[in-house]
A protein has these predicted regions:
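S-adenosyl-L-methionine-dependent methyltransferase catalytic module, highlighting the catalytic core
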Residues: 23-126
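A short acidic, Gly/Pro-enriched loop at the edge of an enzyme's catalytic core
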Residues: 2-13
Length: 126
């Protein structure tokens, strides 16, 4: 996987529910880091099962029905756990993990259909 863009060519990066689909997410993160300029920032959203300490992935699971049963969707390759932010840090990013929905009451979360997903804001250090 190589993104056909020059190094340090973007100020902002948004990745919304992509990394769970790619074969080598760490390499993809490395590419995101490479194309983001120093001081640039991004939002990297993925489904994270906060009840899991560690990400679960098994490349031997290729059957779509089995992937759906295990990962929740036929085209997912992993289930991220609470270590997701750590994966982003391993790529070199500074990471802020924001539990956005926590600022709302249970009633407000229901009324506005706010998911329990966290927001991961990354920054490439200067």
């Amino acid at each position: 996987l190589q993104i056909p863009l020059p190094d340090a060519s973007y100020d902002v990066l948004i990745c919304n529910h992509l990394l769970e689909h790619v074969a080598d997410d760490r390499r993809a993160l490395g590419e995101f880091y490479r194309i983001l300029r120093p001081g640039g920032w991004g939002i990297l959203l993925s489904p994270v099962d906060r009840s899991r300490a560690a990400t679960f992935e098994d490349d031997s699971i290729t059957d779509p029905a089995e992937r759906t049963r295990i990962f929740g969707q036929y085209d997912h390759r992993r289930i991220y756990g609470r270590d997701y932010g750590g994966r982003l840090r391993e790529a070199g990013f500074e990471v802020r993990e924001i539990d956005y929905a926590a600022r709302f009451s249970a009633e407000e979360r229901r009324r506005y259909a706010l998911p329990d997903d966290w927001i991961y804001v990354v920054r490439r250090p200067l």
